[in-house]
């Protein structure tokens, strides 16, 4: 019995090994794959063959954001003058779990996508390959999707077209392997229109997907609102401001109207020039220059628009409601008013009869500007009719006149009155000039006693039966006459004219 050779034994073992590989491949698939992957591949192929469909491809492209409009780019624009395609096209790359269950492709730098311009329909001619500007190639970006899951996206945020018409974009996916570039898949967008500059409506507001990717670091132009939307919002804000000003103006006008009605019911005249000017200011101002423009813009009666609101305010606040009382004009025609004039005019009515001349009064003008009557030519002195019809009210100026004898004008000659009683020293008090001009009242010179205000200068009436040194007695009064017919009904009778008149 001969033994088998070593070569024959090796060949038999090799044949048995190959037979086992064939059986394993027929049952479990490719032996180079791990058992779980082999089972997945076998199940996918078996299901596809059972249904009669082709197996699912390893790569899938989904256009997440389609281009809609664009403006023609001249190629000479600088910076933001060149408008890109709106909205920016975004393409997502999806790989099946069978081909890459760990989703390692999201970290791969070897995937990239190129964008080309093609005709919008079959009847249109093919565009020039050099009709596009900007960044035509995009690498893969790993970004978080709206569903909070990671994904791979190709973003074209800087694409412009130099010709008008209707076109489509073709996106082609490539992969770098060693020193070669391998084509993987492609996708085509929907047709969109490229408008000339004069017909372009403007860039629309950025989509939520664009904002989300911009927040994650992708360089994209984010627009909050379009120009048309911004203009509408601005006009709405101006309308709100105009409405507030109109309400405030109506409140001020009603307040002035109520105040004017109160003044009409009051018997005391009130100077309301300040309120009248305030009411006039309510219907005028800076915004009145633009009220016609705002009225045409907003289409309703506001503070700025329409003459109806302004006329209503002027009608409610009429200047005639604030008429001032008539003031005497004679005091302003002859001389300037003084401090004592204003004090006397507040408490005493004007007197139309001449003032009696008193002995010892200095006719010189006071260097302090104090005068003795509220109106020129009149003296605010009244007769005490309660004690006697021919008694004058005591005048404290007669006592002061003896102090001011040295300040009398040298050109004035005084003669003693025949009925004037002499004081104890035997010296007669000089009397004023026989007649003075009716337009000028005697000015009282107080000298060193100018700080002492007399009852007459303060507009007060003094009633007493006692006489004063230097005052004329009851028998010395000359020229008693009735009051002027121009006086009021409430005026007391018994005024005395100036002696010698």
Curated annotation (Swiss-Prot):
Main location: nucleus
Disordered: annotated span: 26-55, 67-88, 228-274, 378-455, 474-501
Domain remarks: The N-terminal velvet domain contains a NF-kappa-B-like fold and is involved in DNA-binding.
Subcellular location: Nucleus
Motif Nuclear localization signal in this chain: 364-371
GO CC entries: nucleus
Keyword check for Cytoplasm: no
Keywords assigned: Nucleus, Sporulation, Transcription, Transcription regulation
Recorded superkingdom: Eukaryota
GO process terms (BP): sporulation resulting in formation of a cellular spore
Family (UniProt): Belongs to the velvet family. VosA subfamily.
Subunit structure, as described in the record: Forms a heterodimeric complex with VELB; the formation of the VELB-VOSA complex is light-dependent.
Pfam families per UniProt: Velvet
Protein name: Spore development regulator VOSA
Amino acid composition bias (Basic and acidic residues), ranges on this chain: 67-85, 237-252
Function: Component of the VELB-VOSA heterodimeric complex that plays a dual role in activating genes associated with spore maturation and repressing certain development-associated genes. The complex binds DNA through the DNA-binding domain of VOSA that recognizes an 11-nucleotide consensus sequence 5'-CTGGCCGCGGC-3' consisting of two motifs in the promoters of key developmental regulatory genes. Appears dispensable for the development and pathogenicity.
Ranges for domain Velvet: 52-223
Protein's gene: VOSA
